[in-house]
């Protein structure tokens, strides 16, 4: 970045914003890059501003019992805010005084007032000086207020981010992602956008008082008639605003409903294509869109009337002010024209400035209160550690994730005193009222010495991760003691990758030691993976590691934990995503050898790990089931495998444990009852859900499902929501900001769960921050990286003692025992970390885009032509009236000497000039009112255009090949359907209408002035030309700066979400300061772009003002020097010239806004033009069968099969020379794969993580770019339509897809099967008992990815889909990942029964599942290495043989035979359900 010219700019350069000229020239000539942007001034840096506000906020916290954030802001920014307010007031005063001088100039042409004629030239000079002074006062004031608003936002951003890193996990569990992002985006944007209007809350009343005093002098009491009309108009507009809000709130639910399903489809587009659900998903989304558009049109019509009311209100204001006075007294032209000018200023103050200012203060104070509540929330407390201790010990430790009853009761008592819930937690008491819950850990005791390995095991939800969280201090124990040194390293269950290189992710700020680093790389089996990258370990990883496989991410996370020199290593299931061989090697070389001298706590479920552990701790339902050595475990607890693997029979469950996921669902939502109902007098259970109830995660480490808290009590009436916990104006439906860079109000969307007709749990589902931290899926992110510079700070750590020379942790690069942690980031490299790829859209919207947009709907062209015809009629009538006016004015001038009272003084004389002028005003405004009929069809048609574009874009995305979609980010696609469609629906129609209307007004005004005084036309032409040239010059740079600003906003929120995902890791490594620095750098990058955009915008506005001032000076002196005694002519010219200024500037600004909004249209067109998948039309050889099943095709003419056979009939598959690529022109993931599978054969896929097993399954479905040939039952994939080919397969993907809709829709989106068939299949796969527990059963609506279902239930849903389709070939991609044992056994049983005659291709890490396969396909280095039977693989050197230890090999085949006998006993309990109790399959 370059140094800013502002630092050396002169006073005049700052006043006229001339210092921005270099960037404007560069932006006009070429595309701007980040390196072209000027550096942020030190006074605007995030470090400086955050430190300034943080210091005042700490002072406020220390000095007062009830601290106020607004007091801290006042001490930081008040005096500058007040100074710019005074400048703004002076600028507005000049505007109010201008009509006085105008009236004096008009009066100087009165024949009875020749005395004034001599000073007309001086009055004109004074009027011109006022026009010159106004921009010199106004623009610096507006820029200064925008600048202060920007500084407040930056300081608040930083304060919120720092607070977020300090929040306790308990608080994070209560805050949703949407609330946090909304707090940063929508709330804080109010300071940026609204601070310039804040002063009008006092300026507008003073201005109205001044104007009414001046009008009283002209019209006496009748002036208040116009004011009364304006007040009534303001109230009417407020009422229309309420109607708009009502329609918007109704529509917001539908928008969110559409976006939820669209988001689910985009994130799972590969599954959608694999299931051939493109048409079904398109129909579901379009049905919701239809309802949404009905509400959109209603809201647009009301907004249209609201906008039009302002335009034609001027006539009524002037009429109501002048007519009462004229009925009593005579009125002269000077008073009419002065009144018109006064009323224009008065109308703006009453109907625009004051209401906007009030709304600004309301929104700003609300945002400040929310942020204040957030800043006072409970922080994460580090435990007190003894750095000299060498042991890890727990004594009688009990812990709850939820707050206890005592805390809640005390909080309720405190809050009831002032009838106010502090910290925004007003729903906290009721949402947790009965949720005392089961302790997540209770009476835990263990002790391990230095260098020992403790293996922690237990079924799902037993409390294993909570145990680690308690050691780290994330979970505060309610009882007992914890003892350890505090020097901890942590590896999360769900791998977290920060944007950067592999090397940076592993070192993570610790001083670099080559020997240690290489040892860790080798021990974590990363050498081979790194060697495949051209950049080796300097390869850039995207946010979340999206370019890596799950196993690679897991190994990098483990390497990060191992590299750090700590006393205690907490490893939370680090091998979950690894294949058997890799897991075994890493456990031996890393955990057992490399870390042999370190204290380790490993969460695992593998028997081999337990055997090699020094101590074993088995948890069951939060309690210590066993603690001791493995040999003691075998002798004392022979049934330990049931606790470890979750094989408890139903009858052995405790009463609490018997409650299934459905009972937990009941707990989550509500029992209908009054808030005052005693705990033992709850009413009948109901699934009716209230919005104020605490929203829980679907899949959190806290796992409330396994905490088993059965009941809840909530109020019937919605509780008010304040603070970050909810929006006060929407008590039932939480407002959620999905897209932080969306500037529209509709971006804050209340959640609606009514996706389809049928029962649903009507609760505002949110994803808590804690859930984000514990999600296993990797979100799409930016695939660029960040490097650090050499500037570092030291963090002293206690040195290790008694280590051997071979111990990697004894080595130090530096002389002391400190760790070097980098705090500096280069801004250029930061762009590589987070920035999206720059969109290839021209700086200015092309004419081709406008033409294409206009021709989308044929009616739009006719509407525009009709608007033009009406405008020509307006101009014609106006010109006729003006000619009459001029002729009658000349007649009156001749008769004026014979009249007792001059015709200029009597308003009702039919031949008077001002009466004709009054007729003209009436006719012109009447025609303007006809704009209602002109503009309404335009707005209506533009919304229809938006509907068509949305439909085309949705169809294009669903039909696009995966090779194209793989190059796009899910967030970018979703932005097209959210932000850009919102712009097309809401902003673009009314903005286009405003621009057209303003343009016509300007053209009409210029025509009137030119007819009255042709000389003025000579001044008008160059002024309009100058405006057009200036607009084009500014537009090139401003649009690029706006694009850079938008791109710069993304890293801020990306970094926030990245930090939250890895918050536990950050705290464990003490990396908060570094990430705060990184966040400040991201803020500074955005600030640099935004500040430059504000400055160039002021430059443009100032130049427009200068051009107008020159124009007005020319008009004024031409009128005075060339006009005779035409008082009416001078009044019309000067009045219209003053109006031209504001209207023309408004029109130019509207044209710039239209151009900016049309960029959304360009992006939509770009998506519409995406290529489609190669889907050959059905040939005469293939016809859909009369059977309703889409997975079957009747073969009528094919040499491979007999006539009238159903395809596929056997499932025989032949693959020849298959090569697969994810992206056109990319590297081949698979090369020359050839094999043949017999009908009904089961084939297992073997290979290291990332070897291409999932890619092979995708290639079979033609989801990736493929070369070669595949045949099924003799039919080649080249001779069959793509959709029919995919319907031949049944798929259970690695990433389960459950969209928002009913059970029936999720199982059968096309509605092909009746209920009886669906229930039969549900019974086969073990889903009947689950579905029957929900109200509405098959019509129960699942939302948010089916969060009320366990992962196992979701897998069973996928299995049921394949059974319904009667697929002959089944593809399974790691179906047992994260499955509880019982669901796993159900899937195995179903595969044996329902798919006994089907061909099965299985990618799996569990050895037991692979033993069901007859043959194995081994993939290595993108090629097929082996395709053999299990006996052959065990008899030779292979990866499969290496993964199985010699002692276990003899038992493999007998185990395969006996597994069929044991399975029924483990799943027998599935059918022992009663009406009140259902087995919990999430063990």
Swiss-Prot record:
Enzyme Commission number(s) of this protein: 5.6.1.6
CDD domains assigned to the protein according to its UniProt record, in alphabetical order: ABC_6TM_CFTR_D1, ABC_6TM_CFTR_D2, ABCC_CFTR1, ABCC_CFTR2
Sugar-bearing residue positions: 887, 895, 901
Gene designation per UniProt: CFTR
Record remark on domains: Binds and hydrolyzes ATP via the two cytoplasmic ABC transporter nucleotide-binding domains. The two ATP-binding domains interact with each other, forming a head-to-tail dimer. Normal ATPase activity requires interaction between the two domains. The first ABC transporter nucleotide-binding domain has no ATPase activity by itself.
Gene3D superfamilies: ABC transporter type 1, transmembrane domain (1.20.1560.10), P-loop containing nucleotide triphosphate hydrolases (3.40.50.300)
Domain ABC transporter residue range list: 423-646, 1213-1446
Protein family according to the UniProt entry: Belongs to the ABC transporter superfamily. ABCC family. CFTR transporter (TC 3.A.1.202) subfamily.
Sequence positions that bind ATP 2: 1222, 1247-1254
Enzyme class: isomerase
UniProt protein name: Cystic fibrosis transmembrane conductance regulator
Record region (Disordered): 1444-1483
Membrane-spanning residues: 78-98, 123-146, 196-216, 223-243, 299-319, 340-358, 860-880, 920-940, 992-1012, 1015-1035, 1097-1117, 1132-1152
UniProt-annotated stretches for the region Disordered R region: 654-832
Gene Ontology BP annotations: bicarbonate transport; cellular response to cAMP; cellular response to forskolin; chloride transmembrane transport; intracellular pH elevation; membrane hyperpolarization; multicellular organismal-level water homeostasis; response to endoplasmic reticulum stress
Job of this protein: Epithelial ion channel that plays an important role in the regulation of epithelial ion and water transport and fluid homeostasis. Mediates the transport of chloride ions across the cell membrane. Possesses an intrinsic ATPase activity and utilizes ATP to gate its channel; the passive flow of anions through the channel is gated by cycles of ATP binding and hydrolysis by the ATP-binding domains. The ion channel is also permeable to HCO(3)(-); selectivity depends on the extracellular chloride concentration.
Segments on the Cytoplasmic face: 1-77, 147-195, 244-298, 359-859, 941-991, 1036-1096, 1153-1483
Keyword Disulfide bond attached: no
Lipidation (S-palmitoyl cysteine): 524, 1398
Modified residues (Phosphothreonine): 717
């Amino acid at each position: 970045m370059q140094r800013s010219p502002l630092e050396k700019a002169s006073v005049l350069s700052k006043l006229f914003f001339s210092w921005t000229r270099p960037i404007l020239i560069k932006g006009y000539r070429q595309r701007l890059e980040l390196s072209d942007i000027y550096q942020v001034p030190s006074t605007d840096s995030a470090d400086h501003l955050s430190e300034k506000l943080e210091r005042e906020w700490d002072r406020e916290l220390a000095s007062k019992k009830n601290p106020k954030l607004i007091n801290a802001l006042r001490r930081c920014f008040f005096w500058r805010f007040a100074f710019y307010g005074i400048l703004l007031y002076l600028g507005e005063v000049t505007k109010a005084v201008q009509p006085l001088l105008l009236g004096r100039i008009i009066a100087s042409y009165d024949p009875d007032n020749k005395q004034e004629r001599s000073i007309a030239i001086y009055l004109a000079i004074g009027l011109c000086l006022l026009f010159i002074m106004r921009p010199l006062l106004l623009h610096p004031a507006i820029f200064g207020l925008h600048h202060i608003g920007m500084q407040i936002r930056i300081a608040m951003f930083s304060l919120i981010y720092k607070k977020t890193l300090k929040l306790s996990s308990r608080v994070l569990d209560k805050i949703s992602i949407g609330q946090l992002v909304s707090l940063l985006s929508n709330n804080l944007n109010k300071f940026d956008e609204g601070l310039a209007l804040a002063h009008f809350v006092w300026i507008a009343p003073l201005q109205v008082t001044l104007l009414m005093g001046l009008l009283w002098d002209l019209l006496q009491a009748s002036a208040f008639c116009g004011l009364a009309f304006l007040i009534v108009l303001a109230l009417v507009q407020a009422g229309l605003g309420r109607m708009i809000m009502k329609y918007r709130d109704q529509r917001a639910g539908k928008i969110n409903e559409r976006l939820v399903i669209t988001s689910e489809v985009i994130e799972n587009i590969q599954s959608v294509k694999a299931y051939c659900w493109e048409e079904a998903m398109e129909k579901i989304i379009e049905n919701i869109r239809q309802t949404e558009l009905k509400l959109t049109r209603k809201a647009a019509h009301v907004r249209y009337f609201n906008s039009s009311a302002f335009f034609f209100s001027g006539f009524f204001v002037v009429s109501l002010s002048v007519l009462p006075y004229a009925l009593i007294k005579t009125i002269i032209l000077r008073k009419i024209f002065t009144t018109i000018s006064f009323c224009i200023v008065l109308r703006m103050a009453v109907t625009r400035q004051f209401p906007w200012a009030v709304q600004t203060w309301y929104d700003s104070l609300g945002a400040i209160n929310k942020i204040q509540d957030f800043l006072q929330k409970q922080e994460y407390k580090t435990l007190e550690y003894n750095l000299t201790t060498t042991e890890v010990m727990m004594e009688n430790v009990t812990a709850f994730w939820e707050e206890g009853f005592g805390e809640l009761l005390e909080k309720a008592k405190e809050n009831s005193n002032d009838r106010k819930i502090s910290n925004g937690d007003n729903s906290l008491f009721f949402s947790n009222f009965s949720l005392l819950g089961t302790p997540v850990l209770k009476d835990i005791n263990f002790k391990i010495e230095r260098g020992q390995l403790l293996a922690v095991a237990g079924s799902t939800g037993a409390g294993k991760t909570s145990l680690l969280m308690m050691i780290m201090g994330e979970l505060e124990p309610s009882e007992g003691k914890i003892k350890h040194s505090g020097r901890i390293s942590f590896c999360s269950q769900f791998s977290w990758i920060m944007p950067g290189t592999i090397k940076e992710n592993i070192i993570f700020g610790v001083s670099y030691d080559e020997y240690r680093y290489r040892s860790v790389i080798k021990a974590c089996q990363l050498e081979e993976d790194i060697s495949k990258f051209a950049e080796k370990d300097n390869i850039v990883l995207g946010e979340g590691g999206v370019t890596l496989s799950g196993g690679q991410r897991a190994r990098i996370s483990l390497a990060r934990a191992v590299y750090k020199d700590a006393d205690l290593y907490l490893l939370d299931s680090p091998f979950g995503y690894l294949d058997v061989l890799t897991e075994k090697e890493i456990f031996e070389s890393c955990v057992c050898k490399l870390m042999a001298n370190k204290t380790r706590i490993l969460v695992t479920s593998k028997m081999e790990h337990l055997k090699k552990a020094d101590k074993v701790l088995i948890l069951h339902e939060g309690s210590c089931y066993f603690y001791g050595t493995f040999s003691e475990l075998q002798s004392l607890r022979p049934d330990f495998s049931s606790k470890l693997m979750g094989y408890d029979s139903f009858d052995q469950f405790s009463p609490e444990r018997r409650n299934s996921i459905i009972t937990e669902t009941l707990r989550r939502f509500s029992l209908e009852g009054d808030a005052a109902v005693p705990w033992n007098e709850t009413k009948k259970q109901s699934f009716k859900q209230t919005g104020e109830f605490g929203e829980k995660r679907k899949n959190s480490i806290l796992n409330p499902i396994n905490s088993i808290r059965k009941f809840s009590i909530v109020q019937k009436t919605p509780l008010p929501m304040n603070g970050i916990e909810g929006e006060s104006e929407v008590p039932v439906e939480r407002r959620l900001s999905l897209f932080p860079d969306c500037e529209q109000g509709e971006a804050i969307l209340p959640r609606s769960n009514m996706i389809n007709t049928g029962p649903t749990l009507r609760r505002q589902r949110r994803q808590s921050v804690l859930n984000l931290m514990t999600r296993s899926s990797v979100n799409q992110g930016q695939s660029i990286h960040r490097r650090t510079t050499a500037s570092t700070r030291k963090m002293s750590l206690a040195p290790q003692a008694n280590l051997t020379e071979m111990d990697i942790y004894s080595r130090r690069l530096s002389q002391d025992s400190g760790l070097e942690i980098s705090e500096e980031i280069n801004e250029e490299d930061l762009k590589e970390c987070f920035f999206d790829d720059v969109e290839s859209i021209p700086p200015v919207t092309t004419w081709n885009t406008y033409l294409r947009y206009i021709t989308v709907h044929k009616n739009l062209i006719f509407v525009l032509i009709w608007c033009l015809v009406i405008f020509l009629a307006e101009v014609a009538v106006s010109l006729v009236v003006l000619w009459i006016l001029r002729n009658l004015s000349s007649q009156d001038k001749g008769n004026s000497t014979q009249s007792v009272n001059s015709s200029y003084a009597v308003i009702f004389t039919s031949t008077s000039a001002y009466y004709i002028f009054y007729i003209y005003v009436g006719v012109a405004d009447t025609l303007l009112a006809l704009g209602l009929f002109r503009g309404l069809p335009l707005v209506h048609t533009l919304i229809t255009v938006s509907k068509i574009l949305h439909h085309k874009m949705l169809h294009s995305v669903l039909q696009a090949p995966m090779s194209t979609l793989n190059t796009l980010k899910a967030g970018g696609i979703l932005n097209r359907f959210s932000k850009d469609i919102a712009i097309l629906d809401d902003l673009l129609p009314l903005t286009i209408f405003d621009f057209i209307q303003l343009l016509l007004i300007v053209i009409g005004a210029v025509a009137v002035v030119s007819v009255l005084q042709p000389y003025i036309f000579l001044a008008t032409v160059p002024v309009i030309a100058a405006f057009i040239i200036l607009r084009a010059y500014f537009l090139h740079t401003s649009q690029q700066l706006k694009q850079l600003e938008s791109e710069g906003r993304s890293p801020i929120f990306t970094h926030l979400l990245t930090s939250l995902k890895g918050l536990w890791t950050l705290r464990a490594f003490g990396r908060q300061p570094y990430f705060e620095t990184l966040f400040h750098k991201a803020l500074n990058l955005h600030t640099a772009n935004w500040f430059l955009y504000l400055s160039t915008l002021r430059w443009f506005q100032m130049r427009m003002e200068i051009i107008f001032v020159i124009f007005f000076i020319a008009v004024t002196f031409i009128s005075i020097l060339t006009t005779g005694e035409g008082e009416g002519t001078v009044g019309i010219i000067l009045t219209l010239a003053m109006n031209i200024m504001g209207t023309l500037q408004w029109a130019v600004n509207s044209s710039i806004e239209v151009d900016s909004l049309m960029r959304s249209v360009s992006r939509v067109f770009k998506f519409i033009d995406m290529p489609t998948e190669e889907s050959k039309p059905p040939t005469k050889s293939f016809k859909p069968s009369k059977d309703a099943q889409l997975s079957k095709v009747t073969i009528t003419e094919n040499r491979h099969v007999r006539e009238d056979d159903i395809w596929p009939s056997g499932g025989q598959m032949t693959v020849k020379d298959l090569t697969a690529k994810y992206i056109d022109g990319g590297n081949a993931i698979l090369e020359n794969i050839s094999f043949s599978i017999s009908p009904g054969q089961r084939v297992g896929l073997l290979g290291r993580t990332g070897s291409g097993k999932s890619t092979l399954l995708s290639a079979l479905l033609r989801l990736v770019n493929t070369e070669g040939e595949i045949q099924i039952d003799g039919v080649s994939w080249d001779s069959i339509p793509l959709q029919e080919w995919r319907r031949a397969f049944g798929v259970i993907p690695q990433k389960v897809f459950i969209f928002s809709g009913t059970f029936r829709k999720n199982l059968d989106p096309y509605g092909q099967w009746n209920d009886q068939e669906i229930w039969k299949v549900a019974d086969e796969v073990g889903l009947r008992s689950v579905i029957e527990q929900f109200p509405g059963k098959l019509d129960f609506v699942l939302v948010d990815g089916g969060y009320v279902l366990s992962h196992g239930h979701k897998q069973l849903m996928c299995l049921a889909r394949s059974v319904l389709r009667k697929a002959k070939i089944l593809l399974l991609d790691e179906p047992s990942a994260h499955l509880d044992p019982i669901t796993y056994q159900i899937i195995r049983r179903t595969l044996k029964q329902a798919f006994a005659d089907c061909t099965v291709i299985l990618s799996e890490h569990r050895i037991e599942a692979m033993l069901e396969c007859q043959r194995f396909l081994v993939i290595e280095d993108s090629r097929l290495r082996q395709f053999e039977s299990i006996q052959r693989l065990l008899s030779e050197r292979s990866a499969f043989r290496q993964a199985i230890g010699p002692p276990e090999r003899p038992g493999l085949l007998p185990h395969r035979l006996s597994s069929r006998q044991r399975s029924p006993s483990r799943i027998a309990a599935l059918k022992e359900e009663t009406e009140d109790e259902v087995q919990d399959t999430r063990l």
